[in-house]
């Protein structure tokens, strides 16, 4: 018996519910230039379900995607817009999963890479994580580029919206406040503001080192984010032109009091052989990052000058009283 997935969009036929229950899920909104076939290559049985929202107009392409998906349906919109509608209509849809990877459909990666990225994100209990981008990739934010073999993952305050792996409970929390107004640009800043990533690394949070383990870029996994020239016209531009996406983001940012903030790396970490759970970040890591900031240096210098001035003023007052 086939289960139907009706979320208020077009009807979708999907695979039977038989088979192992998986704890991980990839969700993507796919067009006709997707790279999903790469995700499924190899003889090993992957450990995740694939949920595809197809926004193209080719019935044959949709049929092929439905064959390889756990769930597939047809609709228009961006990933997070569709997710919002899906979870609104089916609140328990993702309940069986520990992590949900909200991934662009054109990311080039293998099934083995996907399995390992999920395993690392789950093991270290990251709220949101992403794989690093190969140097061959389109790099929109320098922090996302592969850092080198000296680290397996970096603890950061920024995870881009094209490949975020969410701890499922955190994704649902964000979707509760997300109104579906953004097609693409700005979704990452929205969920990072919601999770208070913009407050990490501040001097006032010096003692809260445990909070620095919430977001990560996994350098052990390098994927390819293809350049625009490889894809031709970006399919998201057909949904909404870039200028309109940016203008809408500015409106949302003002309405919700969101901020764009400097991207920071708090620690570069290796995965130890004994694999002790938890994130090895110390206050020294925080202090080093804070001290390296030019603004922090100026503040520290100002405080030192102020303290010296107060000491001199006090000494002058004491000398005056003695002279009297």
Segments from the language model and where they lie:
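Conserved catalytic core of nucleotide-sugar-dependent glycosyltransferases
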Residues: 109-197
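C-terminal catalytic/acceptor-binding lobe
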Residues: 1-12, 181-324
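N-proximal low-complexity "stem/linker" segments adjacent to membrane-targeting elements
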Residues: 1-67
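Short, hinge-like loop/turn segments at secondary-structure boundaries
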Residues: 68-69, 145-149, 233-236
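Short beta-strand-to-loop acidic/aromatic patch adjacent to the donor-nucleotide binding site
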Residues: 95-108
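Active-site-proximal specificity loops/subdomain of glycosyltransferases
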Residues: 52-98
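Short, high-confidence coil segments that cap the C-terminus of an alpha-helix
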Residues: 97, 124-126, 213
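Intrinsically disordered, low-complexity, charge-dense segments enriched in Lys/Arg
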Residues: 32-39, 167-168, 235-237, 256
């Amino acid at each position: 018996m086939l289960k139907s997935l009706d979320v208020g969009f077009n009807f979708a036929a999907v695979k039977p519910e038989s088979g192992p229950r998986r704890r991980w899920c990839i969700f993507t909104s796919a067009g006709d230039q997707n790279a999903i076939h790469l995700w499924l290559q190899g003889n090993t049985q992957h450990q995740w379900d694939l949920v595809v929202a197809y926004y193209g107009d080719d019935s044959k392409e949709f049929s092929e995607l439905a064959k390889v998906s756990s769930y597939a349906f047809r609709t228009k919109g961006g990933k997070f817009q569709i997710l919002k509608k899906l979870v609104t209509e089916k609140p328990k849809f993702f309940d069986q999963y520990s992590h949900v990877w909200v991934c662009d459909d054109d990311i080039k990666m293998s099934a083995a890479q996907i399995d390992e990225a999920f395993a690392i994100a789950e093991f270290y209990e990251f709220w949101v994580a992403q794989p690093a981008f190969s140097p061959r990739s389109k790099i929109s934010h320098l922090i996302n580029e592969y850092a080198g073999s000296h680290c397996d993952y970096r603890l950061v305050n920024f995870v881009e919206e094209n490949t975020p792996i969410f701890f499922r409970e955190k994704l649902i929390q964000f979707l509760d406040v997300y109104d579906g107004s953004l097609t693409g640009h700005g979704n990452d800043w929205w969920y990072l503001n919601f999770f208070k990533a913009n407050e990490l690394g501040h001097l006032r949070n010096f003692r809260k080192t445990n909070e620095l383990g919430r977001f990560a870029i996994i350098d052990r996994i390098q994927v390819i984010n293809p350049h625009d020239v490889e894809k031709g016209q970006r399919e998201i531009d057909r949904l909404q032109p870039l200028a309109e996406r940016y203008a809408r983001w500015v409106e949302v940012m003002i309405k919700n009091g969101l901020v764009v903030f400097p991207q920071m790396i708090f620690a570069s970490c290796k995965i130890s052989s004994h694999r002790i759970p938890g994130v090895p970040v110390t206050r020294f890591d925080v202090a080093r990052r804070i001290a390296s900031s030019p603004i922090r240096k100026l503040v520290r210098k100002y405080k030192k000058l102020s303290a010296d001035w107060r000491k001199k003023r006090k000494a002058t007052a004491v000398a005056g009283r003695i002279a009297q």
